[in-house]
UniProtKB/Swiss-Prot annotation:
Signal peptide (from-to): none
Gene Ontology BP terms: store-operated calcium entry
Gene Ontology molecular function: store-operated calcium channel activity
Protein name: Protein orai-2
Organism whose genome encodes this protein: Homo sapiens
Catalytic activity: Ca(2+)(in) = Ca(2+)(out)
Length: 254
């Protein structure tokens, strides 16, 4: 660090000298203070990089677990659902259920693919107890893909999962107490199955709205927190610049 800054350091000097310390003039004290400030800033940058690494690793782990669970549930629901052959389902209902299940599985498998490809490389670096190994991790370059997997798994994937539950309730309950002969389905509210499916939809719609509102609120709170933290860092850098400018003017006077 001293070689890069071209500032000589006396190794016999104390770590935290005072400007009036015996054997060290004001010029040496200013140089030592400058080196300490730059070194502390370098360590803070490394700490920030490691925090980003651990955050990326946590997001990848959460995405992989969530995607594996929800995609597995969707596949089981598709395979295990038993359609009543004697009941004529509405065509839009079957098309919507098939499309929702396919998109749900595709989204979660894509998020799982990203997590599976990137997570081992991040884990390999995070398990090395060396501060300088942070540059070997691909989390900075792969940050857009990590955020994409996180969004697919926790936002879009969960919304599709809620829609999947609603459609599954309609397919499961709609034939209950319905007519067994072929023909158009009975009118709305005429049998128990239709009412049960309607109740599940009425319950799930507020849940979906609450989920969307919470997601937006959480994202805005997170952005506000990051903005405040960056503002504090900018203020600290500004104070450091003012202090260094004052030290340089003092050296010019001397």
């Amino acid at each position: 660090m001293s070689a890069e800054l071209n500032v000589p350091i006396d190794p016999s000097a104390p770590a935290c000298p005072e400007p009036g310390h015996k054997g060290m003039d004001y010029r040496d004290w200013v140089r030592r203070s400058y080196l300490e400030l730059v070194t502390s800033n370098h360590h803070s940058v490394q700490a920030l990089s490691w925090r980003k690494l651990y955050l990326s690793r946590a997001k990848l782990k959460a995405s992989s677990r969530t995607s594996a669970l929800l995609s597995g549930f969707a596949m089981v629901a598709m395979v295990e659902v038993q359609l009543e052959t004697q009941y004529q389902y509405p065509r839009p209902l079957l098309i919507a259920f098939s499309a929702c299940t396919t998109v749900l599985v595709a989204v979660h498998l894509f998020a799982l693919l990203i997590s599976t490809c990137i997570l081992p490389n991040v884990e390999a670096v995070s398990n090395i107890h060396n501060l300088n190994s942070i540059s070997e991790s691909p989390h900075e370059r792969m940050h857009p893909y990590i955020e994409l997997a996180w969004g697919f798994s926790t936002v879009l994937g969960i919304l599709l999962f809620l829609a999947e539950v609603v459609l599954l309730c309609w397919i499961k309950f709609l034939p209950v107490d319905a007519r067994r002969q072929p023909g158009p389905p009975p009118g709305p509210g005429s049998h128990t199955g239709w009412q049960a499916a309607l109740v599940s939809t009425i319950i799930m719609v507020p849940v979906g709205l609450i989920f969307v509102v919470f997601t937006i609120h959480f994202y805005r709170s997170l952005v506000r927190h990051k903005t405040e933290r960056h503002n504090r860092e900018i203020e600290e850098l500004h104070k450091l610049k003012v202090q260094l400018d004052g030290h340089e003017r003092s050296l010019q006077v001397l």
